[in-house]
Amino acid sequence: MSFSPQEALQRTIEHREIFFDEMVDLMRQIMRGDVSPMMTAAILTGLRVKKETIDEIAAAATVMREFALAVPVADSTHLVDIVGTGGDGSHTFNISTCAMFVAAAAGARVAKHGNRSVSSKSGSADAVEALGAAIELQPAQVAAAIEQTGIGFMFAPIHHPSMKVVAPVRREMGVRTIFNILGPLTNPASAPSVLMGVFHPDLVGIQARVLRELGTERAMVVWGRDNMDEISLGAGTLVGELRDGKVREYEIHPEDFGIAMSASRNLRVDGPEQSIAMLRAVLDNTPGPALDIVALNAGAALYVAGVASDIGDGLARARAAIANGSARQRLQQYVDTTRTLVA
């Protein structure tokens, strides 16, 4: 007998956990459209108020992966996702998108999962499209792009068609729900390593442990103390690192890597055009905090991808890829390849 939505709602009201198998059953019902919009909204609200557990998040992510259109990557060596939950309210330029090109040029292979803007001035999909790349690639085309360029951008609506069922509910609710933290956990290419930014410090340890439950090999989950969902230059950054099946939590600072502190307001943009201008300036090796934060985050991605021995080594590799022009070339190669794939 399936786990009833009414029982799920009752559990959340009483601040009791929904167990893994029950949550899998419930999420399948929701994703199939078997649960009414009103009941779905009530359950999502109850989970948020109660605070979602590691098992509840892992179970929900497992089902979203089940329903996703997977990208058939033949070789996942050094394959990493660089992703953020968004919702940090910082309105910075597309740091993780820029880091994607840098990390790929420095030896990683990046399968980045993203969407258009919801809370930011420019979502990752908006940025990749504004750079001239085709974003609406089918799974086999994404796999081909990864094979040819070391980069694959996966536009979330294409890979998660079942999300159409809950989209109207989420839109009408207008508040964060479990789905805001599920997106970064449901990479359609099943990248074995991930650099993930989160919007709340509590999620640093939680998401690292959820990734472990989901079988991720290496991960860094980060939250900047200035409320950035990236490794920050403006404050310390809390890290939950998953390695060898263990989660270690610690804090890093830009000075640890010889980088001057810089407030996040120096990285703010008013829209996609400004974001793209800042991204291109970084790839043109223009010195400043924008280049520093991209190199640091790309360096961390190179570390979790197994390309670099530590973040410092990754940072040096990232800076070299920017300085020698290979990151800029990789961007152009990706743009040209995606256009050819959809032609």
Curated annotation (Swiss-Prot):
Sorted UniProt keywords: Amino-acid biosynthesis, Aromatic amino acid biosynthesis, Glycosyltransferase, Magnesium, Metal-binding, Transferase, Tryptophan biosynthesis
Cofactor binding remark: Binds 2 magnesium ions per monomer.
Annotated Gene Ontology cellular component terms: cytosol
Protein name: Anthranilate phosphoribosyltransferase
The protein's required cofactors: Mg(2+)
GO biological process: L-tryptophan biosynthetic process
Residues at which 5-phospho-alpha-D-ribose 1-diphosphate binds: 84, 87-88, 92, 94-97, 112-120, 124
Provenance organism: Stenotrophomonas maltophilia (strain R551-3)
Record-linked InterPro entries: Anthranilate_Pribosyl_Tfrase, Glycosyl_Trfase_fam3, Glycosyl_Trfase_fam3_N_dom, Glycosyl_Trfase_fam3_N_dom_sf, Nuc_phospho_transferase
GO MF annotation list: anthranilate phosphoribosyltransferase activity; magnesium ion binding
Record's catalysed reaction(s): N-(5-phospho-beta-D-ribosyl)anthranilate + diphosphate = 5-phospho-alpha-D-ribose 1-diphosphate + anthranilate
Cytoplasm listed as a keyword: no
Family membership: Belongs to the anthranilate phosphoribosyltransferase family.
Binding site for Mg(2+) 2: D229, E230
NCBIfam families: trpD
Coiled-coil annotated spans: none
Listed pathway(s): Amino-acid biosynthesis; L-tryptophan biosynthesis; L-tryptophan from chorismate: step 2/5
Primary role: Catalyzes the transfer of the phosphoribosyl group of 5-phosphorylribose-1-pyrophosphate (PRPP) to anthranilate to yield N-(5'-phosphoribosyl)-anthranilate (PRA).
Binding site for anthranilate 2: R170
Source domain of life: Bacteria
EC code(s) of this entry: 2.4.2.18
Keyword Metal-binding found: yes
Subunit structure, as described in the record: Homodimer.
Binding site for Mg(2+) 1: S96, E230
Gene: trpD
Positions of anthranilate 1 binding: G84, N115
